[in-house]
Amino acid sequence: MSEHHSDTRDDLDESKFVTFEGSPFQLYQPYPPSGDQPTAIATLVEGVEDGLSFQTLLGVTGSGKTYTMANTIARLGRPAIVFAPNKTLAAQLYAEFREFFPRNAVEYFVSYYDYYQPEAYVPQRDLFIEKDSSINEHIEQMRLSATKSLMERRDVVIVATVSAIYGIGNPSEYHQMILTLRTGDKIGQREVIARLIAMQYTRNEQDFQRGTFRVRGDTIDIFPAEHAEMAVRVELFDDEVDTLHLFDPLTGRVRQKIPRFTVYPSSHYVTPRETVMRAVETIKDELRERLEFFHRDGKLVEAQRLEQRTRFDLEMLQELGFCKGIENYSRHFSGAAPGEPPPTLVDYLPPDALMLLDESHVLIGQLNGMYNGDRARKENLVDYGFRLPSALDNRPLKFPEFERKMRQVVFVSATPADYEQRVSGQTAEQVVRPTGLVDPQIEVRPASTQVDDVLSEITERVKANERVLITVLTKRMAEQLTEFLADHGVKVRYLHSDIDTVERVEIIRDLRLGTFDVLVGINLLREGLDIPEVSLVAILDADKEGFLRAERSLIQTIGRAARNVNGKALLYADRITDSMRRAIDETERRRAKQIAYNEKMGITPRGVVKRIKDIIDGVYNADEARAELKEAQQRAKFEDMSEKQIAKEIKRLEKQMADYAKNLEFEKAAQTRDQLALLRERVFGANVGDHVSGGE
């Protein structure tokens, strides 16, 4: 069990855990399902049990779709994989599922590259670009933890991005390489070391870190690749495993004695020695054929280039069992025929697993597009002798291949696209929100006076301490509008595509805190913009047909005001297009259904009160009060500190902030930054950023 979810938290209310017959999941239910949730859950569970391959959960923003997914998974008791369209959304889902399943294996499988430049060749300029990348250690560990959980247990929920349809090592070979140690096993020190090296662990006596081991006499310490804060000590006596202990690699303190331990390979690309030798032979055969082809065509430069590069890789494979760019030879290792799909994370899933595609209208497009882009780049590398043709088989899955590997699927979206509507056996509607909030009122106004009209609407909203989102069609329009509003005294920011994830999170946070009141953007469909304080969404030039003014985009954008009791959407247009008509009709239909439900149940809509720290919706946190109390105590503590102590505390917070950022916990990082600002203000009388300017 990997330690990032084995911490069964003590502060959870035992009575809130729910279990279902025959299911290994323990669902933490802070509140019972309400609104449309119970029917949606029952429909989906029944559909899966009846053997439906595809179903859709049509859930509006703020209706608690994640909660419905968690309930469905818990009731079915099968391993599940939840796909998200990007890392930010995946991180959000991962955090939510960990809240719902604190005692089960919730895993995270996204691309481990912080930065990635694939190798490529530009023939026009004779320019070869080497592969260059920086791997995020922490995410690599979580990926290894995900495949390990799938092999060991059934109560697994994996949150993944499209990264899951890219090739990784073959599951059966990965399985063959596992080393299980039990007390009393007959195994010598040299054999343990040989097995570890075959699994791509490195021996390192000085720097003991993930994926390394160290030897002291008959004691071997192993730092498993899928763990972040736990290592295992194997003590041998007379070629037999005497004892096994788990210990803290940082302090060396022994945690517990254990009867057995399974060491998993340190990479998904490990292969048994005989497979490597077999691959070396088939690579040589392919190289010979390819060189003959180049010589026949008189392409001598390409032939020489290919031979030099491949021979070097072959030597590395024979000596070490792996080489740089080993994934380009994956077909030779798996023994697959040319053109066959590569093994991916999907192959590690058991046959009865459940697949949930969140924001499926975006995901299906992504899954469709991955293969073509990859293919175009690799064909150049092959044609010009940088790679063997078999490199073309190290690729993401084509969509039809992914379809063949799909298990039972639930598409989740507020606006399902044509594909989902075509293949779904049934659709579960989740239109009613547990909070009683209804979809915003829609008004269409003339586009000719849109800018002045928006300004007067903003003034009203600012008085009521509410926020406004405005979506326009072009960068130029966005810049001009931002400038115009700023000149009229409106606190406004412009959100454009060049802003990175961390800064986006900060801008959204500042909007919620009221640092500014209006956010102008072009594409407001991106994640994280479900902001309860927003009571008005203005769509300028709503009648210009195009991707951002299509029916689905309009419904999604209008939905951005659905978390506020006074939510309203203004569409500025001189004529009503078909897309507008359909979007307005659908929103009105949902609104009518919601109002009818509220009247029947006697519910008064209440706004969502979200702590500013959460981008994560729908999870009520009992530690809210505790956090506020702690903050007040912190402030009091700072008052009593000497300057030296404060300097120390600043150092500590800076490190903490960097750690949070490294672990992709941008929200916490931003919070720590606010604490730092508080402290610096105490010392310097003003928050001077990161440096102190020389005063007198």
Swiss-Prot record:
Pfam families: Helicase_C, ResIII, UVR, UvrB, UvrB_inter. One of its GO terms (cellular component) is cytoplasm. A motif (Beta-hairpin) lies at residues 112-135. Keywords: ATP-binding, Cytoplasm, DNA damage, DNA excision, DNA repair, Excision nuclease, Nucleotide-binding, SOS response. GO terms for biological process: nucleotide-excision repair; SOS response. Residues 647-682 form the UVR domain. Residues 450-616 form the Helicase C-terminal domain. Belongs to the UvrB family. The beta-hairpin motif is involved in DNA binding. This is UvrABC system protein B. It comes from Burkholderia mallei (strain ATCC 23344).
